[in-house]
Regions:
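Short, conserved catalytic or adaptor-binding loops enriched in Gly and charged residues
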Residues: 92-96, 119-127
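Short, surface-exposed amphipathic charged segments that create phosphate/polyanion-binding patches used
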Residues: 113-124, 148-152
């Protein structure tokens, strides 16, 4: 839609390929836009079982494709606690240099993190619908099934990624260059 004023893609990461044993989790990336009319649109969903190297590749390729198709898109990745999480976050920051990327340690359980997006999805009691539109696409059925069965569903990856994208949209952060003159009286490093 042409009336989207801000885009964010949230990710939920897993690192188990389809051919490994068991029923592993998915890597999910959900793109949500905030529209001028204060509604939201879920415009794209990626949900795949991938090896760790394939996860990195799909995230990079998705950043490239999102920029081409939608312009500026904030990408939000989860950061695990501890040294390994910091190392992975630094690795992603290097891999995605040139894109707007945040690696954030999630707080609270999955249900608590999903509540703000769920509230917009459902709307006020008595309303016919909430404030979230969904682009018609091949991934709709899988996405709706997971959302409708959350939190009892076996997989919660797309819901987690949706919550992350929504939180990023509503974080109040702006993505513009700093002013030419800072309040410290020193010229901005961005001004040459």
């Amino acid at each position: 839609p042409p009336d989207v004023i801000k885009w964010a893609r949230g990710w939920d990461l897993a690192a188990t390929s389809e051919d490994e044993k068991g029923d592993p989790a998915y890597t999910a990336g959900v793109l949500i836009g905030k529209r001028r009319n204060e509604r939201y649109i879920v415009a794209d969903v990626i949900n795949r079982r991938l090896s760790s190297s394939d996860v990195r590749e799909i995230i990079k390729q998705t950043c490239i494709a999102d920029r081409v198709k939608y312009g500026r898109v904030a990408t939000r990745l989860p950061q695990d606690p501890g040294q390994a999480g910091k190392d992975q976050a630094q690795s992603f920051m290097k891999l995605l240099a040139g894109f707007t990327v945040k690696c954030i340690q999630e707080s609270g359980d999955k249900v608590t993190r999903a509540e703000p997006f769920s509230a917009q999805w459902l709307g006020l009691e008595g309303m016919d619908k909430g404030n979230v539109d969904v682009l018609i696409a091949p991934w709709n059925e899988e996405y709706f099934n997971e959302c409708e069965n959350f939190p009892q569903s076996k997989f919660k990856d797309m819901v987690d990624a949706s919550s992350s994208a929504f939180t990023e949209l509503e974080s109040g952060a702006t993505y513009s260059a700093p002013p030419k003159d800072s309040q410290l009286g020193k010229s901005s490093y961005w001004n040459k």
